[in-house]
UniProtKB/Swiss-Prot annotation:
Family: Belongs to the transferase hexapeptide repeat family. LpxD subfamily.
Keyword set includes Lipid biosynthesis: yes
Protein role: Catalyzes the N-acylation of UDP-3-O-acylglucosamine using 3-hydroxyacyl-ACP as the acyl donor. Is involved in the biosynthesis of lipid A, a phosphorylated glycolipid that anchors the lipopolysaccharide to the outer membrane of the cell.
The protein, known as: UDP-3-O-acylglucosamine N-acyltransferase
Gene designation per UniProt: lpxD
Entries under Gene3D superfamilies matching the protein: Hexapeptide repeat proteins, MurE/MurF, N-terminal domain
Domain of life (superkingdom): Bacteria
Length: 354
């Protein structure tokens, strides 16, 4: 593994050293586990005690952070971003080894760039394309007419179905499926004389995954009924997410695990959806919208709004409702007592109840 002096790391991430810049570091580790030859980072005050007790040779911190006496630190504007860049230096991305494994299946009409790597039991179908320096792990299937761009990594058992397109520098984690059939059925009460049935609507569109996207393990992006389901540039989608047919996910959006987006909904740029949030179909979710975990979005959301709850409402109102809910039992008791008191007062005054 490579090693760097603290001064070299500072130059790479645009930081300032406080302490020994000549200190040589050979790895990065959590505060609790880092040794004197490793660097760590501190950006969450929950871990203040771990920071103070850490044996790390150096720690990445932000400009205003208070530092124990004698602690060597690297001050940067954004500690988490600097951590990511330093971690990449110590653990660089895997590079393709230009080869096609003997047990891989490449159709004669497929075009696989000579610099790409196709591992055992991967399959590239008729008229499919795999770009320069891309890596296909074992069990990957790139179907008929599908396209995978340059510098992509498709991990084990990824499926890119027919006519779907994956851009450049895309990462698809294990089990990800691009272009599965959308969930479309028309109810036929007669069933051509065989009784009622759900008649399958052909899903003849495709999926386009733009550049610099990452999709998590076992995430599914359904092909459009007609046209294109699109994942915008730089979007990052976690494990076990379901994107339905004809959905448009805007650039730089973040969808956390188990989010579900129903058909034909459009997400703007930079939308963030917390884990297990559900969004019904045919909605417009504006740029920069934030959706709380486990929310159920059932109406359009304007750009810049933050919503929570089910059905989702503006976050501030939801917080007030949750605060009231905690006291609901006591409020009910108080109301019951007040009603009894009113009844007693009416009885004393000789009034009839309304």
């Amino acid at each position: 593994m490579a090693s760097y002096t603290l001064a070299e790391l500072a130059a790479r991430v645009g930081g300032a050293v406080e302490g020994d810049g000549s200190l040589r570091l050979d790895g990065i580790a959590p505060l609790e586990e880092a040794s004197a030859s490793e660097i760590s980072f501190f950006s969450n005050r929950k871990y203040r005690k771990a920071f103070e007790a850490s044996r790390a040779g150096a720690v990445v911190v932000e400009p205003r952070e208070q530092v124990p006496a004698g602690r060597t630190v690297l001050r940067v504007a954004n500690a988490y971003l600097a951590f990511a860049k330093i971690s990449t230096l110590f653990h660089p991305p895997r590079e393709a080894v230009p080869e096609v494994a003997p047990t891989a299946v490449i159709h004669p009409t497929a075009r696989v760039h000579p610099s790409a790597q196709v591992m055992p039991l991967a399959c590239v179908g008729p008229d499919a394309q795999v770009g320069a320096r891309s890596i296909l792990f074992p069990g990957v299937h790139v179907a008929d007419g599908a396209r995978v761009g340059e510098d992509c990594v498709l991990y084990h058992n990824v499926v890119v179905r027919e006519r779907c397109a994956v851009g450049n520098r895309v990462i698809l984690q294990p089990g990800c499926v691009i272009g599965s059939d959308g969930f479309g059925f028309a109810f036929d009460p007669e069933g051509e004389g065989k009784g009622p049935r759900h008649y399958k609507v052909p899903q003849v569109g495709n999926v386009v995954v733009e550049d610099d996207v990452e999709l998590g393990a076992n995430t599914c992006v359904d092909r459009a009924t007609l046209g294109t389901t699109r994942i915008g540039r730089g979007a990052k989608i976690d494990n076990l997410v379901q994107i339905a047919h004809n959905v448009q996910v805007g650039p730089l959006s973040l969808l956390v695990s188990q989010v579900g987006v129903a058909g034909s909904t459009k997400l703007g740029m930079g939308v963030v959806a917390g884990g297990q949030a559900g969004i019904v179909g045919h909605l417009e979710i504006g740029d920069g919208v934030r959706i709380g975990a486990q929310s159920g979005v059932m109406a359009d959301v304007q750009a810049g709004e933050t919503v929570s709850g089910s059905p989702a409402v503006p976050h501030g109102g939801w917080l007030k409702a949750m605060a009231s809910l905690e006291h609901l039992h006591d409020m009910r008791k108080e109301l019951r007592e007040l009603r009894r008191e009113v009844e007693r007062l009416r009885a004393d005054a000789g009034e009839d109840e309304p």
